[in-house]
Amino acid sequence: MAARCVRLARGSLPAFALSLRSSPRLLCTAAKQKNNGQNLEEDAGQNEQKTDLPSTEKTLMEEKVKLEEQLKETMEKYKRALADTENLRQRSQKLVEEAKLYGIQGFCKDLLEVADILEKATQCVPQEEIRDDNPHLKSLYEGLVMTEVQIQKVFTKHGLLRLNPLGAKFDPYEHEALFHTPVEGKEPGTVALVNKVGYKLHGRTLRPALVGVVKGA
């Protein structure tokens, strides 16, 4: 049975080959159909890829814009944080410096009372009594003057400046007016009398000078 099939196949091969030689168009048509099928599949795949590509690009662009906005917001927060930190550092440094400068303010105010007493004691000594034939009073007076000079040197060393504005223009930040009075030959608004000297500590008024101010006519 198998041998018969083989003989039949061998017998039909020449006829099949002859039909192919006599009909080459069949081969070309089949090949074209095959190629066309492959091309259609490739075109469909490319079209599908082209359709997906714009969507992907759009998504990427949206993500890019979102990330850029987040980055911008983060940088702004970072800059604000840096500015706040710098402001805090400067304020803290200023507070420390002021504490160093003005920490002795209360102590200085107490010393001013001592300086006032020394000044009054010196002024109370009659100048006509300061003579060589009165050595005790002369020595006492000279001792008071030396002490007053020395305490003013200490004040200056620590930034404490004496204010004696006699004849100067009245300054409400440094002077306190006790009264106003017309004074002949004096410019209105100037200090005519200093009742009590004032003091400034590192440029800040520690105690205003108590003064009388010339009043305009």
Swiss-Prot record:
Pfam families documented for this protein: GrpE
PROSITE patterns reported for this sequence: GRPE
CDD domains on file: GrpE
N6-acetyllysine PTM positions: 94, 100, 215
Top-level taxon of the source organism: Eukaryota
Modified residues (N6-succinyllysine): 94, 120, 215
Annotated InterPro entries: GrpE, GrpE_coiled_coil, GrpE_head
Transit peptide (first-last residue): 1-27
GO biological process, one term: protein folding
Compartment list: Mitochondrion matrix
Keywords (A to Z) from UniProt: Acetylation, Chaperone, Mitochondrion, Transit peptide
GO molecular function, one term: protein homodimerization activity
Chain ranges passing through the membrane: none
CC annotations in GO: nucleoplasm; PAM complex, Tim23 associated import motor
Keyword Transit peptide on entry: yes
Binding partners and assembly: Probable component of the PAM complex at least composed of a mitochondrial HSP70 protein, GRPEL1 or GRPEL2, TIMM44, TIMM16/PAM16 and TIMM14/DNAJC19. Binds to HSP70, HSC70 and HSJ1B.
Family note: Belongs to the GrpE family.
Entry function: Essential component of the PAM complex, a complex required for the translocation of transit peptide-containing proteins from the inner membrane into the mitochondrial matrix in an ATP-dependent manner. Seems to control the nucleotide-dependent binding of mitochondrial HSP70 to substrate proteins.
Name listed for the protein in its UniProt record: GrpE protein homolog 1, mitochondrial
Source species: Bos taurus (Bovine)
Gene for this chain: GRPEL1
